[in-house]
């Protein structure tokens, strides 16, 4: 029989850099999970992606054990890297802060494909382009 789920915790943690300090410690500590065990497992699983912030979904069971699933980095972070900017525009409709090409958008779609809710590559590209527009990043040919 399957274990009974106690809680599901969603966090965004830099790959390979989980430690018991906030936000990881308090989020897991309140559910009675062994925080150091999670940090060691997460860091070992995400060493190859160092430098990226990864969303992680942690499933905590009644017996205080856990499993976790890492997702692809958020589209906004990938777009900021592609456009070489520190942050998005405060007024995206008026002020453009950077540019990305369609080819860069296509690369981001390849990275994010498993986490996107799109049936075609074109639809996924439109989703990423929409995120770029909302950040004040111009999409050029």
UniProtKB/Swiss-Prot annotation:
Gene3D superfamilies, per database record: Ribosomal protein L11, C-terminal domain (1.10.10.250), Ribosomal protein L11/L12, N-terminal domain (3.30.1550.10)
**PTM field:** One or more lysine residues are methylated.
Keyword list (alphabetical) reads:
Methylation, Ribonucleoprotein, Ribosomal protein, RNA-binding, rRNA-binding
- Species for this entry: Methylacidiphilum infernorum (isolate V4)
Q: Name one GO molecular function term.
A: structural constituent of ribosome
Gene that produces this protein: rplK
* Entry-linked SMART domains: RL11
UniProt KW Membrane keyword: no
Assembly and binders: Part of the ribosomal stalk of the 50S ribosomal subunit. Interacts with L10 and the large rRNA to form the base of the stalk. L10 forms an elongated spine to which L12 dimers bind in a sequential fashion forming a multimeric L10(L12)X complex.
- Which PROSITE patterns does the UniProt entry name for this protein? RIBOSOMAL_L11
Function text: Forms part of the ribosomal stalk which helps the ribosome interact with GTP-bound translation factors.
Please give the Pfam families that the UniProt record associates with this protein. Answer: Ribosomal_L11, Ribosomal_L11_N
SUPFAM superfamilies under this entry?
Ribosomal L11/L12e N-terminal domain, Ribosomal protein L11, C-terminal domain
Membership in a protein family: Belongs to the universal ribosomal protein uL11 family.
GO BP field: translation
- What is the name of the protein in this document? Large ribosomal subunit protein uL11
Q: Which GO terms describe its cellular component?
A: cytosolic large ribosomal subunit
């Amino acid at each position: 029989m399957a274990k009974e789920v106690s809680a599901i915790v969603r966090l965004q943690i830099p790959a390979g850099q989980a430690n018991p300090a906030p936000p990881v410690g308090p989020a897991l500590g309140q559910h009675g999970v062994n925080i150091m065990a999670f940090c060691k497992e997460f860091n070992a699983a995400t060493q190859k992606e160092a430098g990226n912030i990864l969303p992680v979904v942690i499933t905590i069971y009644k017996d205080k054990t856990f499993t976790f699933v890492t997702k692809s980095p958020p589209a906004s972070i990938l777009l900021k890297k592609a456009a070489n900017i520190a942050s998005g525009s405060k007024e995206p409709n008026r002020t453009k802060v950077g540019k990305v090409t369609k080819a860069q958008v296509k690369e981001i779609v390849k990275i994010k494909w498993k986490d996107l809710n799109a049936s075609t590559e074109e639809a996924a590209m439109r989703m990423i382009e929409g995120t770029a527009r909302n950040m004040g990043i111009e999409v050029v040919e």
